Amino acid sequence: MAKTYDYLFKLLLIGDSGVGKTCLLFRFSEDAFNTTFISTIGIDFKIRTIELDGKKIKLQIWDTAGQERFRTITTAYYRGAMGIMLVYDITNEKSFDNIKNWIRNIEEHASSDVERMILGNKCDMNDKRQVSKERGEKLAIDYGIKFLETSAKSSTNVEEAFFTLARDIMTKLNRKMNDSNSAGAGGPVKITENRSKKTSFFRCLLL
């Protein structure tokens, strides 16, 4: 059977339990919102294929449990991720403070050039806000990461967040392929995973 996509990108949603990772995933993958989701047990993923610059991108989006007791399960999936969304709840100060801990986990376990984005979720609940948008923006700037406030309930910025992350990954892939070709490699390239956690995730190999 012919392949129905040009690229496969593996993405992770990480953050504390209850920040809305599963709701974001369902809003993007199925355009659905459900307030009765129970806390995610282990890890699950959804698929959605999008189009960017004439290319079909298959997004495999993993929803990882935020509770401390599942952290080892989450860690096993960092190495395969090409993009990671760090999610906090704007009505929960602690979930925002813990973003720094999640970033340290990424730095320890993920590839050095994985694309990252911080999402301040539940922005529809502005009357219960504990974390200002400015604080979220400042944290993102400090780490050199893009930032958006989102709402799975109202669908605010959900599409934009996933499309932005996918575009950043695609831009990086294209740049690396161009660098390989300009270095005299020539011919088609295949993107493969580099298992070393402190080196680039992306390697270009001649087919």
UniProtKB/Swiss-Prot annotation:
Protein name: Ras-related protein Rab-8B
Coiled coil (residue ranges): none
Annotated control of activity: Regulated by guanine nucleotide exchange factors (GEFs) including RAB3IP/RABIN8 which promotes the exchange of bound GDP for free GTP. Regulated by GTPase activating proteins (GAPs) which increase the GTP hydrolysis activity. Inhibited by GDP dissociation inhibitors (GDIs).
The organism of origin for this protein: Pongo abelii (Sumatran orangutan)
InterPro entries documented for this protein: P-loop_NTPase (IPR027417), Small_GTP-bd (IPR005225), Small_GTPase (IPR001806), Small_GTPase_Rab (IPR050305)
Domain notes: Switch 1, switch 2 and the interswitch regions are characteristic of Rab GTPases and mediate the interactions with Rab downstream effectors. The switch regions undergo conformational changes upon nucleotide binding which drives interaction with specific sets of effector proteins, with most effectors only binding to GTP-bound Rab.
One protein family per Pfam: Ras
UniProt function note: The small GTPases Rab are key regulators of intracellular membrane trafficking, from the formation of transport vesicles to their fusion with membranes. Rabs cycle between an inactive GDP-bound form and an active GTP-bound form that is able to recruit to membranes different sets of downstream effectors directly responsible for vesicle formation, movement, tethering and fusion. RAB8B may be involved in polarized vesicular trafficking and neurotransmitter release. May participate in cell junction dynamics in Sertoli cells.
Gene: RAB8B
